[in-house]
Curated annotation (Swiss-Prot):
It comes from Bacillus subtilis (strain 168). It is found in: Cell membrane. The keyword Transmembrane helix applies. It holds the Pfam family Abhydrolase_1. Keywords: Cell membrane, Membrane, Transmembrane, Transmembrane helix. This is Uncharacterized protein YbdG. The gene is ybdG. Residues 94-166 form the AB hydrolase-1 domain.
Length: 325
């Protein structure tokens, strides 16, 4: 028996030493690569100080309306990933892409990502970069919480919301992260902080961005570099862990019924008849019913719909804005 325990102890210590050695090696390699890639990160936008932290806002175009593009969770380089869409809007309008804390060229804030903090940072970044309200918000995924909360707290600042396959505030409340999911989020952050994500690039950035041609070859390399640097950092981790509390804050306020809302529902062919797609459509319909002016349009494609249907999104958005003006 003593011999067995001795063998098990040796095996355990050996495995622990191997894991430590691999982790240290990956960490060193990751930071070596970060130092090499730093030369690529020359900036894209206007960097402003928000509560002692640097935040980046990219803007282009001119016109009466300002469309604010708000990325989903983990979209580490939104000014690059969403270029294929916002470049269509900027031909006749002003656009702004806000890098939330921990995204793009913005610094990691290391706060708990409470929705009030997130919203005030976004508002200050826009104002300090010369983008004054009212805005037409273009949220994607988890940014749906911030967009709706913004319209609830500052309705005069929001001209309309064009929601790209967003997560509704009440969905983050109804489908609260389980204890196991929260452990997965924390574990994933730990692995990425060491640098293991380097070995699964398809999980770090969207290969579709590289496949398409709206970025130059140089921009594609910058896009990759930002993703490797920022992917699933502390702010992105806390953003997910805080989603239930943030959704609850919005749910507990009256719906901003005067705000015109266009919901773009991304539905892929293979998931069209799935329980998720059917329930999501019902959720969207119930949500839209709370507004004086609201419409839902179904688009063929997966969640990152701005990559697959940019022309259709632009067309539907312009039609909707002409209708509500």
């Amino acid at each position: 028996m003593k011999t067995l325990w001795k063998v098990l102890k040796i095996v355990f210590v050996s495995l622990a030493a191997l894991v430590l050695l691999v982790s240290v090696s990956v960490f060193i390699y990751h930071h070596f690569q970060l130092n090499k890639e730093a030369a690529l990160l020359k900036g894209k936008g206007t960097v402003v100080d928000v509560d002692g932290k640097k935040m980046n806002v990219y803007q282009e175009g001119s016109g009466k309306d300002t469309f604010v593009f708000m990325s989903g969770s983990g979209i580490a380089a939104p000014a690059y990933e969403m270029k294929g869409l916002y470049s269509k809007f900027s031909k006749e309008n002003k656009i702004a892409v806000v890098d939330r804390a921990g995204y793009g060229y913005s610094e990691v804030s290391h706060d708990d990502r409470d929705i009030d903090t997130v919203l005030e940072q976004t508002r200050k970044a826009l104002m300090k970069s010369g983008n004054k309200p009212p805005y037409i918000l273009m949220p994607h995924s988890i940014s749906g919480i911030e967009a709706m909360y913004w319209a609830q707290k500052y309705p005069k600042e929001i001209k309309a919301i064009i929601a790209m396959d967003i997560g509704l505030p009440q969905q983050y409340v109804t489908y609260k992260l389980s204890g196991v999911d929260r452990l997965k989020v924390r574990g994933f952050h730990l692995l990425t902080s060491i640098g293991f994500h380097r070995f699964i690039p398809s999980a770090v950035y969207n290969p579709e961005v590289i496949r398409q041609s709206f970025l130059t070859d140089e921009e594609k390399e910058i896009y990759k570099a930002i993703n490797f640097k920022q992917f699933f950092n502390a702010d992105m981790e806390h953003e997910l862990l805080q989603s239930y509390q943030n959704g609850s804050k919005s749910v507990n306020l009256p719906a901003p019924k005067e705000t015109p809302v266009l919901i773009l529902d991304a539905v892929s062919d293979q998931n069209r008849h799935s329980k998720y797609a059917i329930q999501n459509r019902k959720d969207y319909e119930a949500f839209a019913a709370q507004f004086n002016t609201a419409d839902i349009k179904e688009l063929r494609g997966t969640h990152s719909i701005y990559l697959y249907q940019p022309d259709q999104i632009y067309k539907l958005s312009m039609e909707f804005m002409r209708k509500v003006r």
